[in-house]
Amino acid sequence: MTATTITVQGTHIAWYDAERATVEISAAFDGAKRDEVFARATQTAADVTAEITPLHSPDAGPITWWSSDRVNVWSERPWNNDGKRLPLVYHATIGIRAKFNDFEALSRLVEKLAVMEGVNVGAITWDLTDERRKTVTDDVRRLAVEDAVQKATAYASAAGVGTPSVIAIADPGMLGDGSGGGIGPAPIMERMAFKAQAMDAGGGAPLALSPEQIQVSTSVDVRFSTP
């Protein structure tokens, strides 16, 4: 009896709790005098780093890593509603990033910085530790292959042929017959946005950050042969 070839794509999606959070902070000012704008930005950035440095410990946290950009200063001449050029306006901004392993400490810092003049708290990126990321990536890949085996076994049973044996495994699209597609060759780690519950107008409830889980997904093409 002629062997039957079965080619399927296995997929797996898993969700994991975030273990790290990186917050983006900036000190930004603008005005008519370059030196004044520069000085305000650098002083405010120094005030922010003064809040960060006592919290920094690579091993213990709550801040495991942080960095600060050089000050960026530029100018522009805006237009008014009548189409006339206005005097120069100078802008200065300094970016700061900090990675946390303690989300309550992150909430407290964000709450404190949010009321500082010239300070903007931007995106918060949620992630896993490097070690955890490698572990879950291996798990997701293994489960994607198991999904492919289950599919091929079901197809073989429905077709009335023998138990399928693996003859090729590849990232999507690499089996050479155009059978790929799908999610992609490498596990995709989707870092979901955070939810924040800010203080009410009376200042009663503290800021609470609630990270969504991180999605890790992958696909694999597997070719089987049946007797």
Stretches found by the model and what they are:
Residues 1-227:
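Short, charge-dense linear interaction motifs
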